[in-house]
Amino acid sequence: MTTKEKLLALLEDSKGTFFSGEEIARTLQVSRAAVWKAVNALREDGYTIDAATNKGYRLSPDSDILSPQGIRRFLKPEYRDLDLTVLPTAPSTNALVREKANQGRPEGCVIVACEQTDGRGRYGRQFFSPIDSGVYLSLLLRPTAYSPQQATCLTA
């Protein structure tokens, strides 16, 4: 995990709480300069990171960007190591998961997008999935020995 990803995970886990640059550097085992670079990189990605003298940095409570770190904090511990990709936009999460399946990825690969430009629903019909109106995801499953009735529960 990069310093930027580690910093985002730390800030997401304690959203709204200030951390001094020194405290972050010690926790992530990096220099203060590396912390500063990671903060700026997150800001460039659109995250609202507040900085206050004698308080430090915090992820603004109003920050609402979907991220793997933000999702993982709500997952049960046994699911936190899933292969999780979050994209602002994707042609189709299902098509991307299908590509991963064809590459031999194991069950549990998840693709999440804030928008799909070519989403498909049942029978290949177009699935309208614009930005800011939902979260779209596909999960790679490799079920074995499912009856047609059980498969309906997975696909409906």
Task: Say what each PLM segment does.
Residues 2-156:
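N-terminal lobe of the biotin/lipoate ligase/transferase fold
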